Amino acid sequence: MDPFLEFRVGNISLNEFYRRTIQSEFERILEDPLSNMKNYRFSKQSNYSTKEKTPLSIGVNCLDIDDTGQVLLGGGDDGSLSIWGLDESLHRNDEGEQELINKRLNYIKRQPHQSDDEPAQIMGYKNKRTRINDNNTMRLVHSFQTQRNKYRMYRQSSAAVPVQRSHISNKTDSPIGFSETLSETDSEASISHHKYGITTLKWYKADNGMFFTGSNDKTVKIWDTNRFEAVQDINLGYKINQIDNNVVDDSSLLVVASEDYYPRLIDLRTMNSGVTALGMGNQTRMQSEILCCKFNPVREQIIACGDMEGGVKLWDLRMRNRLYSELKRNKNRFKTINNDDNDDQSDVYFSSNQSKAHLRCCSDIVWNSEGSELCSVGMDGKLNVWRPFTEILQPEGLASYSQLGTQDLSRIKYKKRVSRRLLWFDKFLLCITDNGEVEIYNTEEKKLWNKLEYPMVNQVKKNQASHCQFSSMIVQTNIMNSVGLKLFFGTNNNTVSDGGSIFECS
């Protein structure tokens, strides 16, 4: 029966009707994604032009959409940042019809001739007004609430160009209970941009007036969205691979995966108290670079991390500096790497009956929306779905798991080409490969459902096409302006597309 009719007669709830509608939209997009695909470049020009575009020769390393579904954030491999308003502007297409398009609201990058002590150049629009420089002005950069009090954190700053957006939050209506000037590791001018490529970024869950970025310059930056400038610089001393923010509305926790052997935890409420390193100083064997980290969407105290050796570890913040569990698998349930069916042949990749989650490095992990299952992908060519919280565990404490699709050693060729490879939406799981495609799996049927290949406008040489890769992706789940659900893919810097692009599937 049609979901709308079921909702009208009272067979399903409003939430179930919304979930089925979103799933139907997602299936519609994935059945023929190339038919309704739009291409947006990270253009230096503010206005939209279908005929003349000045491409920015950079790759789009990471994308994220805020909880309102109206603002898209993109990070480039040269340290640049772009912010887009989705369905922000009207444009007349080739048929003469008006259609909604995405509009770049702001852009910032470090210029090639710019020294580290100079502020980054912010490229805005003509209708924006520059605020007067007032060093005595304090502005809100973060707010949070406890059971008894409300707090706001302020910072003294200089002039910047504001982003005129009505749906970008600027929470200033709560009573002042506490104010603290955030400390910085460098001078104010030196934190206004990233020196090297941005590897990861994340919106603040509770308020889109703030977002976070991590870079190869070994820093995590906290940004003010309205002014589009960095207000806090946290130097960790290691290249940043991935960051994540807790999904709880009033959460102030950030987890950071870096080249260090220990995941780092940052509490925005106690910035001056330092950064917590999980597992440091105890008996936990931590001898591998952390590549990925994710908060559990339901059990907010659980953090999952994947490392270079193929291990996947779970941390419980309620257990002080202790490992909650490590996901392992039994060698008897897996064939050797050459798929030999001879039981007498031992698997040289296992030294005991137990093994890490992957034979080689774990490139990315992702939770399902219920927080009950965790999917991991590794360079051993396997996609594993784990159920770490099942009451009945496997013998010797091994977590319950299953494999999605078949083993493909060519799926992941590079350890750190992409910061985020996995996206889990409803029953579908998307995986960015190193073969110029996105694999789409049905997690209920445990098999490959569809593939999205890199769109080629013209016939190109095979050696050129091999360099065209997807590098990031995000899904807009909020249905805005009656357009429906959307998928966004960022691409690398390649000669075929004259630089990185953002592809929109709707």
UniProtKB/Swiss-Prot annotation:
InterPro entries associated with the record: G-protein_beta_WD-40_rep (IPR020472), Rad28/ERCC8/Ckn1/ATCSA-1 (IPR042238), WD40/YVTN_repeat-like_dom_sf (IPR015943), WD40_repeat_dom_sf (IPR036322), WD40_rpt (IPR001680)
**Protein's cellular compartments:** Nucleus
Kindly state which keywords UniProt assigns to this record, in alphabetical order.
Answer: DNA damage, DNA repair, Nucleus, Repeat, WD repeat
Q: Name one GO cellular component term.
A: Cul4A-RING E3 ubiquitin ligase complex
Which one GO biological process term can you cite for this protein?
A: DNA repair
Q: What are the coiled-coil residue ranges?
A: none
The record's section on SUPFAM superfamilies has: WD40 repeat-like
**Superkingdom assignment:** Eukaryota
Record's keyword annotation contains Repeat: yes
WD repeat spans? 55-94, 193-233, 285-325, 357-396, 404-451
The task this protein performs is described as: Involved in transcription-coupled repair nucleotide excision repair (NER) of UV-induced DNA lesions.
In Swiss-Prot or TrEMBL terms, this protein is called Radiation-sensitive protein 28
What species was this sequence derived from?
A: Saccharomyces cerevisiae (strain ATCC 204508 / S288c)
**What taxonomic lineage is listed for the species of origin?**
Eukaryota, Fungi, Dikarya, Ascomycota, Saccharomycotina
